[in-house]
Amino acid sequence: MSRNELDERIETYYVRVRGVVQGVGFRHATVREAHALKLRGWVANLEDGTVEAMIQGSGAQIDRMLAWLRHGPPAARVTEVTFEERQTERRFERFQQQ
């Protein structure tokens, strides 16, 4: 790990995605994108038809993930993405689907 990576501040964001985001491979595609961006955390379906995620990484990584979540995989129809930074000491080991 480089010195820059060690110095980089780790941020954690809680995200909700609304629209046609269940039954379209959204969680699976989110895991793939998170792995490509070297993010950690999780993604899950909620009973109200939305998808929630906790994403953890550098600010630049999170910005790229939020941009991707605004459209998601091809079959998804995202209408809204909301997010807020969360303060936590917890460090996720990987990004996974719940």
Curated annotation (Swiss-Prot):
Keyword Ion transport assigned: no
SUPFAM superfamilies: Acylphosphatase/BLUF domain-like
Gene3D superfamilies named among the record's database cross-references: 3.30.70.100
Residue positions of the active site: R27, N45
PROSITE patterns: ACYLPHOSPHATASE_1, ACYLPHOSPHATASE_2, ACYLPHOSPHATASE_3
Stretches assigned to the Acylphosphatase-like domain: 12-98
EC number: 3.6.1.7
Pfam families in the record: Acylphosphatase
Keywords annotated in UniProt: Hydrolase
GO molecular function: acylphosphatase activity
Database matches in InterPro entries: Acylphosphatase, Acylphosphatase-like_dom, Acylphosphatase-like_dom_sf, Acylphosphatase_CS
Catalytically driven reaction(s): an acyl phosphate + H2O = a carboxylate + phosphate + H(+)
Domain of life: Bacteria
Family per record: Belongs to the acylphosphatase family.
The protein, known as: Acylphosphatase
Organism whose genome encodes this protein: Burkholderia lata (strain ATCC 17760 / DSM 23089 / LMG 22485 / NCIMB 9086 / R18194 / 383)
